Structures are given as structure tokens and as C-alpha cells.
Amino acid sequence: MLAPTLRAARPFGFRFKRILWVCIGLTTLFVFITSEVLLVADYPMYHAYRLQVIADRQLLIPHTLAGIFALFIGPINFSSRIRQRHFTLHRVLGRIYAVSVFVGSFTGIALAWGRPGLPGTSMQAAAWMVCTTAAVVTARNRQIDVHRQWMARSYAVTFTFVSSRVLNLVPAYWNHLGDVFSAVGVIAFTLASLLIVELGLNWHELTTHRR
């Protein structure tokens, strides 16, 4: 009786992962268009921020590149097919991901230095580095299941760089970016992302009664 149950569970898990990655991809595309494309096009509401971006470009360029590397390496390394068939590539990309996290974290803190958003950015960067470090350590210790869990947490923090920009076109939201409300928002997005991952990692235990 167990075999049919397991066979039924696998397609469900596969479909869920596919839907999840599609949603993540569509959200990323939406944010790219409504934030980055409009920023380059000098959208009126973004004009003051555009000037700030130009002024901060020396730190912002490595920060952005690091974030992009982490954002796109994550889904590749979560692929069990790539991990099994191209393990060397998986390890190389994992190292690039880890370096990107630390570069993104420190440049993010440097960009926020002396500004109201520093507490939120520092907390986000700390969570990002801690989760990624735990993922690296558990991988080196060959605790693969635990490694995957920490990578899920790390990528949840990575994705806050996208999720926190979904509402950018809403004036009431955009007008508070850069002030104390922004710092609270970054912390809230980070904690919410980690909470969602924890619920996902423990969903079976939360929904199944042990006999």
C-alpha cells in the first residue's frame, strides 16, 4: 500500500515545485519591468531615486551583480537533475552563490550606511549570511538534507530583493522608501520569507498525525 502513496506524492511535489518556480519567475519579470525598466526610462516617480542610483553606482554595480548571480543560481542548484548529473557544476555554482551573498551583503550595508534604512539592511544581510554560511558548513559536513533546508532559507532571503519591490508602483509604498518605514519593511519581508520557508519545510509534520 505504501508504493502507490509514494508514487502519488512525487507527482504532487513535482507539480508544486514547478508552480512555485513559475510564480517566482513571473514575479521577478514583473519587478524587472516595473522597477528596473521604468528606472532606466526615467519614470517620473523614480527620478529622485534614479539620481541617487547614479551617485551610488560604484557600490551599486557590484551589489546588483551579486544579487543577480544569487537570484539565478539558486533555482539551478535546487534542480535535483542538475545536482545528480553535473555535481561539479553544482559545487562551482554553489561557491559562486556563497561569494555573491557576502558581496551583496557587505555592499548593501555600505550603501545603507548613514541612512535610515541601515537597521533593516543590516538585519537582512545578517540573516542572508548566516543562512548561507550554515548551508556551506552542512554541505562540507555532508549533511545534505540539512544543507538543502539552509539553502532554502538563504534563497528566501535572496528573493526578498524581488518581493520587497512588488509594490514599488504604489505611491503610498514608494514614498516611504528610504525612511524608517523602509527599514521596518525590509525586516518584515525578511522574517515573512523565512517563516514561509519554515512552514514549507515542516508542512508534513504540521499536517500529518503520527500514529
Question: Where is each model-derived feature located?
Answer:
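Alpha-helical membrane insertion/targeting regions
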Residues: M1-R211
